[in-house]
Design a protein with these regions (language model features):
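Short, solvent-exposed coil/turn segments
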Residues: 1, 21, 119, 228-230, ...
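Low-complexity basic/metal-binding stretches
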Residues: 268-275
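ABC transporter nucleotide-binding domains
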Residues: 3-8, 13-216
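Generic marker of residues within folded, mature protein domains
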Residues: 1, 137, 223-227
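ABC transporter nucleotide-binding domain
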Residues: 176-267
Length: 275
């Protein structure tokens, strides 16, 4: 049996009197896209900071390929590509020059780096725009280049922190297509979002977070099963279903709960796609 790429076990993180993350556990298998779904303030960014080794937990641990992760553990971090919400690109460099710069920071060079830049530009759909200055890029193109930087060193796990924030619907769709291409390539991805339809589209399994607690976890079919023309969904899976329902309401993804089986009527899409 193949070992998981990532195991997070009992993560707790406090900031003063605030418990931002409270006993969160999950794992990511090879080739799996795992989504952390929750409203702003749910604890998503704190979790990925711990997973990436930027922030130490107050309790619990994370392991990638069996190696413990934490601040200062360089060997484990080499397996992770972190793509934060903030853009890490230089506007007066071309897309290709940005990738070359960050590749050299990661100790890549020569023909290996050139080949890898070509591969990354193809994966993110910018093979025809790699020679353009990034200040001429659209918001979505900049986001995709940001993803490309995280891919350069061929990590076993790519972490994407809300990569579609602040972009128009067309750009957003292009970003999602790039993430789908990563899934086809077999890369493991940890994807955070507060858009439920993004999680449904991209993720093999989804963890629903609210107030730092994992309220429910499961596959798309386990968590949200569409029931045809009634435009209703059925919430299943493990965890506190009532709390998960509350979290989904806060996301604007549901508007009513009826019956013992907790059938949930979907509201209109809350994402920027206009749905």
């Amino acid at each position: 049996m193949t070992d998981p790429v990532l195991v997070a076990n009992g993560l707790v993180r406090r900031f003063g009197d605030l418990t931002a993350v409270d006993d969160v556990s999950f794992r990511i298998e090879p080739g799996e896209t795992y989504g952390l779904l929750g409203p702003n303030g749910a604890g998503k960014t704190t979790i990925i900071s711990m997973v990436a080794g930027l922030l130490g937990p107050d309790a619990g641990e994370t392991r990638i390929l069996g190696k413990a992760i934490g601040p200062g553990v360089v060997s484990a971090k080499a397996h992770i590509g972190l793509v934060p919400q903030e853009l890490a690109i230089y506007p007066d460099l071309t897309g290709r020059e940005n990738l070359r710069f960050f590749g050299r920071l990661q100790k890549l060079g020569g023909d290996q780096l050139k080949r890898r830049i070509d591969e990354v530009l193809t994966v993110i759909g910018l093979e025809d725009r790699g020679g353009d200055l990034t200040k001429e890029y659209s918001g979505g193109m900049k986001r995709r280049l940001n993803i490309g930087i995280g891919l350069l060193h061929q990590p076993e796990l790519l972490i994407l922190d809300e990569p579609t924030v602040g972009v128009d619907p067309q750009s957003r769709n292009s970003i999602l297509k790039s993430v789908e291409a990563l899934a086809v390539s077999g890369m493991a991805v940890l994807y955070t979002t507060h858009y439920m339809e993004e999680a449904e589209r991209l993720c093999d399994r989804i963890g629903i977070l609210d107030h730092g607690v994992m309220q429910a976890e499961g596959t798309r079919d386990e968590l949200l099963v569409l029931t045809g023309e009634t435009d209703r969904v059925h919430l299943e899976g493990t965890g506190n279903l009532e709390a998960a329902t509350t979290a989904l309401r806060r996301l604007g993804a549901v508007k009513s709960v009826t019956g013992d089986r907790r059938n949930i009527e979907r509201s209109g899409c809350d994402c920027p796609c206009g749905g």
